[in-house]
Structures are given as structure tokens and as C-alpha cells.
From Swiss-Prot:
GO terms for molecular function: rRNA binding; structural constituent of ribosome. One of its GO terms (biological process) is translation. This is Large ribosomal subunit protein bL9. The lineage of its organism: Bacteria, Pseudomonadati, Pseudomonadota, Gammaproteobacteria, Vibrionales. Pfam families: Ribosomal_L9_C, Ribosomal_L9_N. One of its GO terms (cellular component) is ribosome. SUPFAM superfamilies: L9 N-domain-like, Ribosomal protein L9 C-domain. The gene is rplI. It comes from Vibrio parahaemolyticus serotype O3:K6 (strain RIMD 2210633).
Length: 150
């Protein structure tokens, strides 16, 4: 199924690209999310008329994400207190939700879906560098310090 992308999508293409995708992916994800429209003659003309507006919107989102990334990078170490055993092993774990809430409490709005933990949840005390993906092209690094709760 041919669709016109209205947003940059990883491993697929950028704004304005006409790509061929499976019909289920287009019908169930891309079109309902507003990330693509079917590549009909009318939609192609409508897209060309709105191209500047859509490019400005994408540029604005990118600029906002870069501004948030600077704020996240400027943060001091975000401290999260959790119950821990004698050797620094946590009872439970620190996940993306906990990290997102701690960064938001420190003054920068971050959603849990933006926090990247490739090695999984944090299970020990110590300092960690956490990657935060604020946009498909914008990454920030937050320092998180996990301490044992009193």
C-alpha cells in the first residue's frame, strides 16, 4: 500500500516520502496516528499544498526537543531513593517510570516512553548515565544517582 509520510519515521522515511508499506501497518498504525495518508491523487495535491506548514511543524517539534535536551543535559545528578540491602542491591528495581518522574520533579518534563534503559531496570545503588530520546533525532543524557533509603 502506497502512503505519504507526514512525519519522520525510523527505518521508513521522512516527511513527504511516498513509501510502500503493508496494508495492516498503514491502516492500524500510520493512518490512525496521523503519521501518514494514503497516496491518492487528491492526497498528493493536498500534501503539496500543506508541505510548508508540515515542515514548519516538524522543525518546531525538533527545536522544542533540542531545548528540552539542553535542560536535561544541564541537570545535576537526579537522586532516587529506594530500599536497598547491605551490598547495595535494591529491593525491587528502578524503571523508566521512576526515572521519568524524578527528572520531571527536577524541573524538566519527560515521559516514561522517552527514557531508554537498554540493559533493563536499575537494580543496584550507584550513579548511572541514562539516555533520554526526546525526538527521533534528539537524545539527551541524564545522570541518575540511586541511593539507599533510610
Amino acid at each position: 500500500m502506497q502512503v505519504i509520510l507526514l512525519d519522520k519515521i525510523g527505518n521508513l522515511g521522512g516527511l513527504g516520502d511516498t513509501v510502500n508499506v503493508k496494508s495492516g501497518y498503514a491502516r492500524n498504525f500510520l493512518i490512525p496516528q496521523g503519521k501518514a495518508v494514503m497516496a491518492t491523487k487528491g492526497n498528493v495535491e493536498m500534501f503539496e499544498a500543506r508541505r510548508a506548514e508540515l515542515e514548519a511543524k516538524v522543525a518546531e517539534q525538533l527545536a522544542a526537543a533540542e531545548a528540552r535536551a539542553e535542560k536535561v543535559n544541564a541537570l545535576e545528578a537526579v537522586v532516587i531513593a529506594s530500599k536497598a540491602g547491605d551490598e547495595g542491591k535494591l529491593f525491587g528495581s528502578i524503571g523508566t517510570r521512576d526515572i521519568a518522574e524524578a527528572i520531571t520533579a527536577a524541573g524538566v518534563e519527560v515521559a516514561k516512553s522517552e527514557v531508554r534503559l537498554p540493559e533493563g531496570a536499575l537494580r543496584t545503588t550507584g550513579e548511572f548515565e541514562i539516555s533520554v530520546q526526546l525526538h527521533s533525532e534528539v537524545f539527551a543524557t541524564a545522570k541518575v544517582q540511586v541511593v539507599a533509603a533510610e
